């Protein structure tokens, strides 16, 4: 399975071979998460490194990103495109999330970062694009991420407009995965080429972007006076006793900042001008005793900022460095420039207008790939109540997707949950009917 992974052109996205590889990557992603959460030997990571497939995954990640920007945009504007099912389209859109999720799981390891080779720069640029978009979005992001909808099956085609909303919802999750990947790259920056450090610090000024993300904290919000935090793909209400507890995403941002600002090799290369200095000093207001108790290493960052506030940073020495440059984005754009509409029309005919028989076959394969027992095992923590955020042991009998700690919470939450429950139940029913017909 791993040895067969390959790069596809934008034109061949959604082809039979491409969908087969998508299923492979989904299964690899699930197995990697299971191994990591269970503390088992991470065979998937080892196989991907041994067979040199990390660059392949990064190339495919950027390829689908470009497809969404260039081809999907055209598809949504085609007046005569009314697909029987948007499931194939959704699978392409979801492919990007699958790959970044797999990379997040395995990039914790130094050998994975090193095996990305020249495409580390491409991955850094990708993460920077996603994090910049996250920082620039308005407070409407919660609505997008919370109301992610399941695509309908062949019996009930959802609109392309709805699919666009699903794509936007996925962007939020993708950006949060990119935050973790950025942190892991910063962990191993001393074993990566100098061009990686320069791109993080001076080309993109990642520390300033991380400051902005900590300031905005897009993974927390308040609704009707109730603090909520985003975790494992959902918003959860936070009990009063946990409101000062650092989230995993806060921790990723702080650790990345610690690495980029305090490692000696980074301090020698980072060009801190007056603007950057002002941005970094904003961090001092966040470094409370409560935060330092949870992440004691940040005391060193506090000292660094205190020193920075009373000193003028020395510009780094100008050295002649032959740097690598990212190539994947420009290569794909240049190869397909002026062809986006033609590619979209080709894919409408060849990939996104399947016969009833093809849809049944796809539904059967997807049902096998997204096995519910396996999906539940991917969640390392116990489920939380959709109403109050406490640990939950009961779930909705209709859709099987929402959890509650007690019946009172389920009754209270029903009006909010009803629409999603109806859609999930209907989608599951339709898929089962398709599989039964095929059988």
From Swiss-Prot:
Gene3D superfamilies: 6.10.140.2220. Keywords: Cell membrane, Cell projection, Cilium, Cytoplasm, Cytoskeleton, Membrane, Metal-binding, Zinc, Zinc-finger. Coiled coil: none annotated. A zinc finger (MYND-type) spans 385-421. Plays a role in axonemal structure organization and motility. Involved in axonemal pre-assembly of inner and outer dynein arms (IDA and ODA, respectively) for proper axoneme building for cilia motility. May act by indirectly regulating transcription of dynein proteins. Belongs to the ZMYND10 family. This is Zinc finger MYND domain-containing protein 10. The gene is zmynd10.
